[in-house]
Regions:
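Bacterial N-terminal signal peptides that target proteins for export
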Residues: 1-9
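Bacterial Sec-dependent signal peptides at the C-terminal "C-region" and cleavage site
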Residues: 3, 18-25
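Bacterial N-terminal signal peptides
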Residues: 8-17
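Beta-strand-rich, non-transmembrane domain signature
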Residues: 22-196
Length: 196
């Protein structure tokens, strides 16, 4: 009886020592963010993502919409591609009425920021196992921002299989960067007059 008590206590301690990891709601197959400072002073932020949904919460709450904030007085938003690949392989293109322009909620009680816009991309054709594909750019006109100044978190709510963050500047400009709390070493190369 005493041995049985020790076995139960040992088993309970092992169960507590190894916490159960919850399954993720979704998974990014690829997430790519590219920031480019062009020679004329204009800037481009290009985001490409592939996101596979696993739960109803991911479809209906977490990832059913994508939000892109920009200032139309100085910036232009270009949606290069937006569609959903369903589990059976069929593709559902995002219709024109699924791109909804609204005032960002943070600017609601701030009249000075009422010129900002938030593009809500409502992803259509969602089902469990579907993959969302979104590729867009926010292009900033010359003179609005003098240099690239990026502070980007590498973490998302769901796991990421492939994450690419790139900064590109003309080769005559210095490229200053810092990677905090990471073990990766950035690769710097110069191609066609651009330092990346």
């Amino acid at each position: 009886m005493k041995n049985m008590h020790y076995y139960i206590v040992t088993l309970a301690m092992l169960i507590l020592a190894f916490p159960v990891k919850a399954a993720s709601e979704a998974e990014f197959g690829k997430l790519s963010k590219a920031y480019t400072l062009h020679a004329d002073g204009s800037q481009e932020m290009r985001v490409q993502k592939e996101l596979t949904l696993f739960t109803h919460a991911a479809m209906n709450g977490l990832y059913g919409e994508s939000f892109i904030i920009y200032n139309p007085a100085y910036q232009e938003l270009k949606i290069h591609e937006s569609y959903t690949r369903q589990k059976d392989g069929s593709i559902v293109k995002t219709p024109d009425n699924a791109f909804v322009e609204v005032l960002p909620s943070a600017a609601a009680d701030a009249p000075a920021y009422n010129g900002l816009k938030e593009m809500v991309v409502v992803h259509t054709g969602l089902e469990l196992g579907a993959t969302i594909y979104l590729d867009y750019s926010v292009i900033t006109r010359p003179g609005y921002l003098p240099e690239l100044d990026i502070c980007e978190s590498v973490e998302e709510l769901s796991p990421i299989k492939e994450y690419v963050l790139s900064l590109s500047v003309p080769d005559n400009k210095p490229l200053h960067y810092e990677l905090l709390n990471g073990k990766m070493t950035p690769v710097v190369k110069t191609v066609a007059g651009m330092k990346t």
